[in-house]
């Protein structure tokens, strides 16, 4: 059975009837590299700082392995909601800023490809409007900076000043 599978798989690949995902090409059979073959991981984040910081760390490890990650941030309370120890919550959009910067810094699989990232927020979350507008406002900023002569190309010298650009945001 193994020989038949190998022959059929080789035929499919050589005749371009199928192709492996990026993590397989980057990782499998490469010495010193995590043998991570999944293209995408779904993460969970709870409404506490340990969980949020763990989300950042998990995404970093996933991106390093050449894979992408998706996360629904709806469990994080809205901005201005009260915290146990006093004060108000920052809300999910503020935590997206840190995760976005991390994704922009870590090249997927150590290669030149940027990390693949999806962020979801439920339509009934109190910060849904802020979530919708955060990326649009930053893209407007990028156009203004580009018109003023700043290098806003994808890997341009000044593109790092634009936030929320490393994820596909979606309302659920």
Describe these PLM feature segments.
Residues 1-172:
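Extended catalytic cores of very large enzyme megasubunits
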């Amino acid at each position: 059975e193994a020989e038949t599978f190998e022959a059929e798989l080789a035929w499919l690949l050589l005749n371009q009837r199928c192709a492996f995902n990026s993590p397989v090409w980057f990782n499998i059979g490469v010495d010193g590299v995590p043998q991570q073959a999944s293209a995408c991981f779904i993460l969970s984040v709870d409404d506490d700082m340990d969980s949020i910081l763990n989300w950042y760390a998990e995404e970093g490890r996933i991106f390093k392995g050449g894979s992408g990650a998706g996360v629904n941030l709806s469990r994080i309370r809205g901005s201005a909601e009260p915290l146990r120890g006093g004060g108000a919550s920052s809300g999910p959009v503020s935590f997206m800023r840190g995760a976005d910067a991390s994704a922009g810094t870590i090249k997927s699989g150590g290669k030149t490809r940027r990390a693949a990232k999806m962020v979801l927020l439920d339509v009934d979350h109190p910060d849904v409007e802020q979530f919708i507008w955060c990326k649009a406002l930053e893209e407007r900023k990028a156009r203004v900076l580009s018109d003023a002569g700043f290098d806003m190309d994808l890997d341009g010298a000044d593109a790092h000043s634009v936030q929320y650009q490393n994820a596909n945001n979606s309302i659920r």
